């Protein structure tokens, strides 16, 4: 399928600029560029309540429906950014829209970024963040039996590994996982890394340079570096995966779906056509992004439905 019109314009501009490389950007410029791109999310959702809090030394953003009270189904969200960028500012509108459309609470976890903080800092923060939320569930208005872990790109990776850590520690488990074009394979061994790796804005170079900064001396086949290849998925809650047609990560997301099912995990996977990596944050120009937003919100409202 052809690229959506708005996304095609982004791709054409990227190619016309001779495919600028994230690898040669200063990290501050890379982060600033990501924040600047948030304008493409569309009109800011204002019909929600937003609160930034610190609990047990970690920072969270809580977004709630305007009249929310009591214990609500809750989405715990990890932002993308290749482990080196992103945060509340880059994902603010997505968090707001998810809360509005789902009628649920949304809590974003701020984890430490590379290159200042290398592996396992983000993984440890992701796990610690959900444990803090779970411990304070009643205080935060969270229905602990209806928690969804979700994230995009690096955040999808963290959601998956966090659920695996919770399972290994025989701790509580979320009701479901929603993984939005997750980064899963540091070895970059899938064919879509080649077919979609150069022209579609978020390139193979973008993704691998993030891995290189965060994983540094960690082997590519470490189970937390490349969770795609793990054999301990059995016992995870239901998983829903979103992939994008023109994404270098498309094939590994779809491979994860097959591997989950082979290991007895309930899994579903939807490929969104005509879009690129990062499309979920492009609701201002992408119909697929708006459709994905509403679908995810529907799933969060009734986990396991």
Summary of predicted features, one role per range:
Residues 164-219:
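Hydrolase active-site cap/lid region
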Residues 134-149:
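Gly/Ser-rich "nucleophile elbow"/oxyanion-hole loop immediately N-terminal to the catalytic nucleophile
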Residues 151, 155, 159:
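Gly/Ala-rich beta-loop-alpha elbow adjacent to hydrolase catalytic centers
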Residues 71-81:
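Short beta-strand element of the alpha/beta-hydrolase
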Residues 241-243:
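Short beta-strand/loop motif that positions the catalytic acidic residue
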Residues 1-67, 305:
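A glycine/proline-hinged amphipathic helix-loop "lid/cap" segment
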Residues 89-108:
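Short amphipathic alpha-helix adjacent to the substrate-entry channel of hydrolases
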Residues 285-305:
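Catalytic active-site module of serine/aspartate enzymes centered on a nucleophile-bearing elbow/loop
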């Amino acid at each position: 399928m052809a690229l959506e019109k708005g996304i095609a314009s982004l791709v054409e501009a990227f190619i016309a600029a001779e495919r600028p490389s994230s690898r040669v950007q200063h990290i501050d410029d890379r982060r600033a560029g990501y924040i600047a791109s948030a304008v493409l999310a569309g009109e800011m959702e204002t019909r929600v309540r937003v609160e930034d809090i610190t609990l047990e030394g970690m920072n969270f953003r809580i977004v709630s429906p305007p009249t929310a009270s009591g214990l609500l189904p809750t989405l715990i969200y990890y932002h993308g950014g290749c482990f080196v960028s992103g945060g509340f500012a880059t994902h603010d509108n997505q968090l707001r829209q998810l809360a509005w459309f789902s009628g649920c609470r949304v809590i974003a976890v701020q984890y430490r970024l590379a290159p200042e903080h290398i592996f396992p800092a983000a993984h440890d923060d992701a796990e610690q963040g959900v444990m803090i939320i779970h411990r304070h569930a009643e205080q935060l208005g969270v229905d602990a039996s209806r928690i969804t872990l979700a994230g995009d790109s690096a955040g999808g990776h963290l959601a998956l590994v966090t659920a695996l850590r919770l399972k290994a520690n025989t701790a509580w488990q979320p009701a479901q996982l929603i993984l939005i074009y997750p980064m899963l394979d540091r070895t970059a061994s899938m064919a879509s890394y080649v077919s979609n790796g150069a022209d579609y804005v978020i390139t193979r170079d973008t993704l691998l340079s993030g891995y290189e900064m965060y994983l540094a001396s960690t082997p590519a086949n470490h189970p937390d570096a490349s969770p795609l290849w793990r054999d301990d998925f059995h016992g995870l809650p239901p998983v829903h995966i979103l992939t994008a047609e023109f994404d270098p990560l498309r094939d590994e997301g779809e491979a994860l779906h097959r591997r989950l099912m082979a290991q007895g995990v309930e899994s579903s996977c939807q490929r969104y056509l005509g879009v690129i990596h990062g499309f979920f944050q492009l609701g201002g120009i992408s119909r697929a992004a708006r459709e994905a937003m509403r679908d995810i919100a529907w799933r969060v409202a009734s986990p396991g439905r």
